[in-house]
Amino acid sequence: DASGGVLEYSVSRDGMTLLYTVSSKTETENGVFAMNAGSRTDAPVALASGPGRYLKLTWDREQKRAAFVSDRDDAASKAPKLKAYLWERSARPAAAVAVVDASTPGMPATLAVSDKGQLSFSRDGGRLYVPTAPPAAPPKAEDDTPADEKVVADIWNYKDDLVQPMQRIRAAQERNRTFRGAY
């Protein structure tokens, strides 16, 4: 029973299919699963599983396709790269397919799939809109300077256009800004 590690779920409009993501202490149990809500005997089917994060479940308007983003193919990296996955509800076997990543033709070299924006389908379901952003910088190496010797200073000038709290808000907005890519 994976219900203890369910992070996100989505039920199709007809109520027949439940999609959910699992984040478990045992990374091999992580994944996106589909379950036939009308049957108590059918076991959940793994659309994608293994170590990594699974985020942003979304259905198209007709409830025939679903999409999500995951870093499962690069989870061991210090700065894992996300991919957008697409699942056709009628597909057999029921595996999701990676459709967009940083190397997809048409994706600018300065952008990658992001987990900051909204993953969505167009109204007619023909396009998948994927959030993209510049790749995150790799984590910095640990500094050996003791905490009591580090200097933290916030410098502000009365001629600044924005007061410091607004500067912080705008900086956070800029860090989380995404661009909409279409597949």
Predicted features along the sequence, with ranges:
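Beta-propeller folds
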Residues: 1-183
